[in-house]
């Protein structure tokens, strides 16, 4: 909002007055615990027993709901726009290890996603799923409850099935994704606006 809003007949500069903030809420006696370097989009929501590691990011309209089960998020995890992270009461907590990427509008519900894995856009990963290190769940896939995806596997379809191994080129791309999202978050950092 660095530029003033121009309306018919007058100009309105909202920068000094409008400071959108993410929603952080306690639930069942637990408040989110975030490393100081975590970046949250202004309309992201983080609720309850959520622990987030250094340089992790939660993007626009994403929801991380630790109200019914603990959510543990490692370092440099990116939870992209519209994604939902949740669990099932008394049954399944969610763990996202370091350098995990959760694609736009994906749902991860009570699963354990290991280091450097990618959950593709619009996919659904259900309770008690284990996604191996460097594995990929393709866009739009539905991984049924209790499934184990081995390290480096590529799963796709509804219901999702193993379609082979992650290619070398995709593995290289994934190795850079977490660092890129840390960089992207830097583009939104406060630049010394009034009141800071």
Residue spans for each PLM region:
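N-terminal segments that cap or nucleate solenoid repeat domains
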Residues: 22-58
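N-terminal amphipathic/basic-hydrophobic helices that include classical n-h-c signal peptides
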Residues: 1-20
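Short proline/glycine- and basic residue-enriched helix-capping loop/turn segments at helix->loop/beta transitions
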Residues: 101
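Glycine-rich hexapeptide-repeat left-handed beta-helix
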Residues: 17-34, 67-88, 92-96, 104-196
